[in-house]
């Protein structure tokens, strides 16, 4: 169990032995006795007879590889987590009806054991509908085609399959004795997902379905409570929970249930063609502090590590292959600083008052028009206060218990003894890490040479079906591939061609199309994350007589949620040609021939054992700007042990594999220059995904994570399928590495030692504020690029001196830090000497390189 007890004083520990209040609405654990019971009352989850304040972290096992799991879980624990939470991904585990898969990235038991071995609890969100920006919301596509099946309503075929899979997962966990009632570590389970927001759209079948789902879950006899997020009418004893950027005002639907937050979004997902969302750590911390101050007892970050949508697992549609989410642990498994460390310090500060928060009495004190205190006191004399300033513009000085406190706008100060500020959400003490992607050209990796395979434009092999008019793309492919060829022929009277500007008009439900006329590419068109359907006009050169039109329809992930989402289709809906003496040729009702997938897919050219397939044609130099081309090249392992990304900026759009492992869809689609980006990010005020965006005018995703465990010591095969055309000679592997570290700390920042603080200390617990810098293991601070002690301004890599600057700044910092792996610099007078700017609040800003 993650470390809460280390923060308790002896007196507080003794109080845990006192009789507990009667438990209301509790679910009683079954088999393993009181020591493993998980129940709840109105205040919190109760584990082994003790109320618990819990920090939970979402890590989705299929979005990383098993070799990464131990480090990810360890980073969550080091960040202050008590729990790891994950969805269960039905379509990954049952890709065909009755055929189960629990290997490699989908080895749920292995992942759960790693969590258990780390001493953490687990929250299992079975769903089995999960949304999660995962293709088809995690539900298998084959289920949509099971006779009579309608998803997520009072439909017997759907409920039968849902119950069968839920039972399969529960039985698997029981077999491993993972539920807390068996002495294991799973303390909560979830059924369904955010259905309350959909009920109105589903009509009369909605409520009976929701009540059935709850009843079905309870009948599984797990011995632990069940939750339903965003399910406002969740029946007792199922706990309804909150998902949002802020949940401090949330109230459960019964006074007997505790206040749980299953999804606090520390960032947001990204779609191809848009800029990058960023949620400032100050605002994430603000939301968490407000939640616990207002009586919350379990909070989960969705997601703490987002990872990667490998292969064709992205949803949306148009969700990027990266599921980085601006999470505290980035896509590559590295700490995102300062976010990770700022939240770690927040968790420590809250945990200092855990007993008082859970067993004490609460009161509310107004400190001003938009300033307030939530105060908790217990019988032992414990006192914890959350001082809040919800004004989004103005800093305030407030008086609480005869003391003055500085409260920045949109911030919360945590006082674990109602006197000393242990943490303020707006004052970030942690260093910032600046990451670089360091390239290693494929040519420098002893490349054996390139081979290619060119796709035919249109029908290859036998025709799969012929129809007058259009078929739906997804209904035809059953999501076995992204690709479906639509091909037709038509005759043109030569007398109608003279002087005309001929235009091809295409309408599509989504998601993308490439058009070929008479075996030549004439254009491409795409929808986007906010609108999958599109129409496009392309100039064409017709010829007298017979013309052949081949349209390649493409999907970019399937719909992952929304009312009746399984009926969202894709594919061509209208094709016309204009420009012939005011005559329009409507091809929509023509005879169309269809071919599912690509020839290279049929021959599995992406598989590791297909490297010597005779269809591969060796090339001394790979062709450039060639559409519909497969590329194969042998590569060495990038040096070092840094995480690796595949730089695809030189390519168009397609799919990539290493040694048969599906890296995923790549598409360095450029976001608009005007896509909501701002020169600076103000954390203050309510956050939305449209705020604090970055990367306008840049590729949405340039680098694609390639786990190091996918590389062999030698003889690695990289396979690329390129749809549009690009320059494969400029593809590189890049190592993700720390380039520089920055810090910006003022003298009034909280400086209590959170590891050793005790509320019974006789002094105020304060030392001078400090800047702490550290480079990764094996690196040291090689140069100090900027330093100013005074009133500097700016952000990392753009700091500027202010009107107050101490001349000893550089010498003090270089003496402490240069050639060191890490260093600490105090903002005390002893360090910098004479105060040259009396009355000015001193700040120390540093930027240093690591090498």
Curated annotation (Swiss-Prot):
It catalyses: Hydrolysis of terminal non-reducing beta-D-galactose residues in beta-D-galactosides. It is found in: Secreted, Extracellular space, Apoplast. The keyword Secreted applies. It is an enzyme of class 3 (hydrolase). InterPro entries: BetaGal_gal-bd, Galactose-bd-like_sf, GHD, Gly_Hdrlase_35_cat, Glycoside_Hdrlase_35, Glycoside_hydrolase_SF, Lectin_gal-bd_dom, Lectin_gal-bd_sf. Residues 765-851 form the SUEL-type lectin domain. It comes from the Eukaryota. Belongs to the glycosyl hydrolase 35 family. This is Beta-galactosidase 3. The lineage of its organism: Eukaryota, Viridiplantae, Streptophyta, Embryophyta, Tracheophyta.
């Amino acid at each position: 169990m993650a470390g809460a007890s280390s923060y308790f004083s002896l007196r507080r520990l003794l109080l845990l032995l006192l009789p507990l209040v009667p438990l209301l609405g509790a679910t009683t654990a079954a088999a393993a006795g009181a020591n493993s019971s998980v129940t709840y009352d109105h205040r919190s989850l109760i584990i082994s007879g003790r109320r618990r304040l819990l920090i939970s972290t979402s890590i989705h096992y299929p979005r990383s590889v098993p070799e990464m799991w131990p480090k990810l879980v360890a980073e969550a624990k080091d960040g202050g987590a008590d729990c790891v939470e994950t969805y269960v991904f039905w379509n990954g585990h049952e890709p065909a009806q009755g055929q189960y898969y629990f290997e490699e990235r989908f080895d749920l038991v292995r992942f759960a054991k790693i969590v258990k071995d780390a001493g953490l609890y687990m929250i299992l969100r079975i769903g089995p509908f999960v949304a999660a920006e995962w293709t088809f919301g995690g539900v298998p596509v084959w289920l949509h085609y099971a006779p009579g099946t309608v998803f997520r309503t009072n439909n017997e075929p759907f409920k039968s399959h849902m119950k069968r899979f839920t039972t399969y997962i529960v039985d698997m966990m029981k077999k491993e004795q993972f539920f807390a009632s068996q002495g294991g570590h799973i303390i909560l389970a979830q059924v369904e997902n955010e259905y309350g927001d959909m009920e109105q759209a589903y009509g009369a079948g909605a409520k009976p379905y929701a009540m059935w789902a709850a009843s079905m879950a309870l009948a599984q006899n797990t011995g632990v409570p069940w939750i339903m997020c965003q399910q406002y009418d969740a029946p007792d004893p199922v706990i309804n929970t909150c998902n949002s950027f802020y949940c401090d005002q949330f109230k459960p639907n019964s006074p007997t249930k505790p206040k749980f937050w299953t999804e606090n979004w520390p960032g947001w997902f990204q779609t191809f063609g848009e800029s990058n969302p960023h949620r400032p750590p100050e605002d994430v911390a603000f939301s968490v502090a407000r939640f616990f101050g207002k009586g919350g007892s379990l909070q989960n970050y969705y997601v703490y590590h987002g990872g990667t949508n490998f292969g064709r697992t992205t949803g949306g549609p148009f969700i990027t292959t990266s599921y980085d989410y601006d999470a505290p642990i980035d896509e590559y498994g590295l700490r995102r600083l300062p976010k990770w460390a700022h939240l770690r310090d927040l968790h420590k500060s809250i945990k200092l008052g855990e007993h008082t928060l859970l067993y004490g009495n609460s009161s509310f004190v107004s400190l001003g028009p938009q300033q307030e205190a939530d105060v908790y006191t217990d019988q032992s004399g414990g006192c914890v206060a959350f001082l809040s300033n919800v004004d989004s513009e103005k800093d305030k000085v407030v008086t609480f218990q005869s003391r003055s406190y500085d409260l920045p706008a949109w911030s919360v100060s945590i006082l674990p003894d109602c006197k000393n500020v242990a943490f303020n959400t707006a004052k970030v003490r942690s260093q910032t890490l600046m990451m670089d992607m360091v390239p290693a050209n494929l040519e420098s990796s002893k490349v054996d040479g390139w081979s290619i395979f060119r796709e035919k434009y249109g029908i290859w092999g036998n025709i799969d079906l012929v129809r007058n008019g259009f078929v739906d793309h997804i209904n035809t492919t059953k999501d076995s591939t992204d690709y479906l060829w639509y091909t037709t022929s038509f005759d043109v009277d030569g007398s109608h061609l003279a002087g005309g500007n001929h235009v091809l008009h295409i309408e599509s439900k989504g998601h993308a199309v490439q058009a070929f006329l008479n075996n030549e590419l004439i254009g491409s068109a795409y929808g986007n994350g906010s609108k999958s359907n599109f129409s496009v006009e392309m100039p064409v050169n017709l010829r007298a007589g017979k013309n052949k039109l081949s349209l390649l329809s493409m999907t970019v992930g399937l719909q992952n949620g929304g009312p009746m989402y399984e009926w969202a289709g894709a594919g061509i809906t209208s094709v016309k040609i204009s420009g012939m003496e005011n005559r329009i040729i409507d091809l929509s009702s023509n005879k169309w021939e269809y071919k599912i997938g690509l020839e290279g897919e049929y021959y599995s050219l992406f598989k590791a054992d297909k490297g010597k397939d005779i269809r591969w044609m060796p090339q001394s130099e790979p062709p450039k700007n060639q559409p519909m081309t497969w590329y194969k090249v042998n590569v060495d392992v990038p040096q070092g042990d840094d995480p690796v990304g595949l730089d695809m900026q030189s390519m168009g759009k397609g799919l990539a594999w290493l040694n048969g492992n599906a890296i995923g869809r790549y598409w360095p689609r450029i976001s608009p220059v005007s896509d909501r980006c701002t020169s600076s990010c103000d954390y203050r005020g309510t956050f939305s995904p449209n705020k604090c965006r970055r990367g306008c005018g840049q590729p949405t995703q340039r680098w694609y994570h390639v786990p190091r465990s996918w590389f062999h010591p030698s003889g690695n095969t990289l396979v690329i399928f390129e749809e549009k055309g690009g320059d494969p000679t400029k593809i590189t592997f890049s190592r993700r590495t720390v380039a520089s570290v920055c810090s910006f700390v003022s003298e009034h920042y909280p400086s209590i030692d959170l590891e050793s603080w005790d509320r019974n200390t006789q002094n105020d617990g304060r030392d001078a504020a400090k800047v702490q810098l550290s480079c990764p293991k094996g690196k040291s601070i090689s140069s100090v690029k900027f330093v100013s002690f005074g009133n500097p301004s700016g952000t990392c890599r753009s700091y500027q001196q202010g009107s107050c600057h101490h001349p000893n700044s550089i010498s003090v910092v270089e003496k402490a830090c240069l050639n060191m792996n890490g260093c600490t610099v105090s903002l005390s007078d002893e360090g910098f000497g004479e105060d040259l700017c009396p009355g000015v609040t001193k700040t120390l800003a540093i930027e240093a390189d690591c090498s």
